[in-house]
């Protein structure tokens, strides 16, 4: 298949392009270059915000630690890395999104080439969830306007070019729910939510990539599975935050975890490709119970292999969520996540 054939097929939605070379081809880890997906983007002279936190005014990145984590991935036979971009690159089309220490497009291109030379497939991630788009700065307050659509389209194209036209682009879109938006004056929902989501799907496909997303909008929206285009790759994430496990027959009918686990089955039945995501991150409930989450990925692999169609189970993603580059915690958390995924997959 030529690149022209791929783009034409994706744009027309005539067929879903081949996702993986073999079943469970993806052995992936989520890592972060940018960190301004959590916080408030406010004027420089505002030094604090009540009940929240401000975005970083500089890139929080340690290249030495980054390379150590990448080396661990290679040692443990990982083959794909999803990279949260956020404010980290200097986007050629919108350099105003950069912060102090953001890296040039040439640096990104060089690192992408290096990762490929190590046998890793780099996948760019641009989180367009309104709960995680502070990296867009003022444009994040222009949701559903022409300037917003233009900027989002431009940075998607930039990511495609900097990553040498990758197979996928992760659009984020997690935690689009009231509990994460209760401080907002306006909330994107219902028809407007769908309008913007479908805009991102089409824009990613028009740029020659396949859209990849967090699936949690489907936990509480029954129409999600029906309306979502089949071209979207689903990252349903389940971290077993409330210690309910994966056994639906043992869960109470009103268990918080039930809709999360059930969504794996619904997506599979509807014919979606999936890359289920687990984590070694510990929720407050787990910390209170003094229960580690080191077995979450192994339990997920066992559940998914037993219950999902092999042809649609395209691999697994580990999300350690080791955000800050504090050497001890950063390496410990990422190494543990990588090792747990490697052990679970065998």
Residue map of PLM features:
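Glycoside hydrolase catalytic-domain groove-lining segments
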Residues: 222-229, 235-280
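Short loop/turn motifs at secondary-structure junctions
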Residues: 25, 77, 163-167, 307-312
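Well-ordered, non-membrane alpha-helical segments in soluble/globular domains
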Residues: 62, 66, 104-108, 148-153, ...
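Transmembrane beta-strand segments of Gram-negative outer membrane beta-barrel proteins
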Residues: 23-31
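N-terminal export signals
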Residues: 5-20
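Substrate-binding cleft of secreted/luminal carbohydrate-active enzymes
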Residues: 275-286, 291-346
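Aromatic-lined carbohydrate-binding surfaces of glycoside hydrolases
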Residues: 30-233, 238, 281
